[in-house]
Amino acid sequence: MTQANNAVYTDLSVDDLVKEALQRGEGVLADTGALVVETGHRTGRSPVDRFIVEEPSTQDAIAWGPINRKFPADKFDALWARVEAFNNAQEHFVSHVHVGSAEDHYLAVKMTTQTAWQNLFGRCLFINPAKYNPAGRDEWQVLNVANFECVPERDGTNSDGCVILNFAQKKVLIAGMRYAGEMKKAMFSVQNFLLPASDVLPMHCAANIGEAGDVTLFFGLSGTGKTTLSADESRYLIGDDEHGWGEGVVFNIEGGCYAKCIDLSEKNEPVIWKAIKHGAVLENVVIDDAKHADYTNVSLTQNSRAAYPLEHVAKRSEKNLGGEPNAVIFLTCDLTGVLPPVSILSEEQAAYHFLSGYTALVGSTEMGSGGGIKSTFSTCFGAPFFPRPAGEYAELLIKRIRGFGSKVYLVNTGWTGGGYGVGKRFNIPTTRGVIAAIQSGALIGAETEHLDTINLDVPLAVPGVETGLLNPRNTWADKAAYDEAAKALAGLFIENFKKFEVSDAIKAAGPKL
């Protein structure tokens, strides 16, 4: 443990970070030993407060708009100086971490936080290398000062908080944000911009490896099942959220997991349950007087979270990477009950559904989305985190799928037998059965039937899954109502896809009216 005269705590151990957080009243310990914290009125990401500095080296490569908002370079310099001075006047914490597990693609990051618990969070989620920055690369700086209050009129921000990326200066400024997920997603966005230049596809996905070395990717928005389904006791976890796919390799961008905790149970999610122990952080989880976590209590938020290092997962890839994927799974939470539990996709269909990113917003992962559930299209299954034009990522995906011969599947973790409020959601064991069949190779070359309106091919049988569930129309009591719902969903797909300039073959791979 080192402490400089200016009260900078540098590269503390996990034990010491927990101790400092407790001494400062930043959180309390749960009965499992995990540190429990609350993040105030922001319990999810704030997309309207995220900016990218407009500067010559990147301005022509970024898809500017409501997601990637421009921020003036001079305003950034002034605000960084102001926040840094505020932070330097008090005790703070510094850790040196990597973002990206592949030797050729890591970023060396100096992470400075005002709070001990956010530094612990960063140590959970980022990579703690045996040797820091062995290649001697230029260092990125993350400055995360939770108690600084931005003044929009003075600082050029949207509110009292901000997340600003500066590629030219290799800086990420996070001010006024207690929700720690902002730090993780900011560095993901950085890698999402940088990796394509090295012919690496960055992906919002989970990944795991079977005993035979076969790799599966799970794409999907928050709440669709990436973390839960990839945490499989029969397989080795690479990671639950952020990966890069290059020639010959899938590598984790992170060194930990950030699991949604709502309704978490030891029975359905044993890997996650066991990982929540000393060194982990529980964010906005309610605990009782006995310090026992109540994962069913959503009084703080539906977006309660657990952050833990991969070392807390018994079966994991020791190198934090694997080979190229045999199976690529797009997870979608379909509110309408129209999509089947599993469809087998062609290359063109893979591109179509990757660009569409159809799913539901489940819970309040983003501030302002409310606690309910609504359908959405999120390009690349993670639109908020991809700075380049979507077509660049889609082209890289097709290149990688074609080059390795990966099989691609669309898996619905949402509703069956009717839409939200009428039907019911697929239970986790059913979806795990679908995943197991995919990973066993049972669906390769399987006999299928074609569903015309949604233009998908559905296997006639899936080992371990009830056959009556496979064609969604058969699960509806009112077949005419299903047909109408299918047409309505097809219309949403078609309308959303108008913004993409792609080949006719890809356009033809989507739903039809």
Curated annotation (Swiss-Prot):
Assigned EC number: 4.1.1.49
Swiss-Prot/TrEMBL keywords: ATP-binding, Cytoplasm, Decarboxylase, Gluconeogenesis, Lyase, Manganese, Metal-binding, Nucleotide-binding
Source organism superkingdom: Bacteria
Example GO biological process: gluconeogenesis
Enzyme class: lyase
Xref: InterPro entries: PEP_carboxykinase_ATP, PEP_carboxykinase_C, PEP_carboxykinase_N, PEPCK_ATP_CS
Keyword Ribonucleoprotein: no
Localisation: Cytoplasm
Binding annotation for substrate: R45, Y179, K185, R305
Binding note for cofactor: Binds 1 Mn(2+) ion per subunit.
Binding site for Mn(2+): K185, H204, D241
Recorded GO MF terms: ATP binding; metal ion binding; phosphoenolpyruvate carboxykinase (ATP) activity
Residues holding ATP: K185, H204, G220, L221, S222, G223, T224, G225, K226, T227, T228, E269, R305, T431
CC cofactor: Mn(2+)
Reaction catalysis annotation: oxaloacetate + ATP = phosphoenolpyruvate + ADP + CO2
PANTHER family: PHOSPHOENOLPYRUVATE CARBOXYKINASE (ATP), PHOSPHOENOLPYRUVATE CARBOXYKINASE ATP
Assembly with partners or alone: Monomer.
Family note: Belongs to the phosphoenolpyruvate carboxykinase (ATP) family.
Protein name (database record): Phosphoenolpyruvate carboxykinase (ATP)
Organism, as annotated: Pseudomonas fluorescens (strain SBW25)
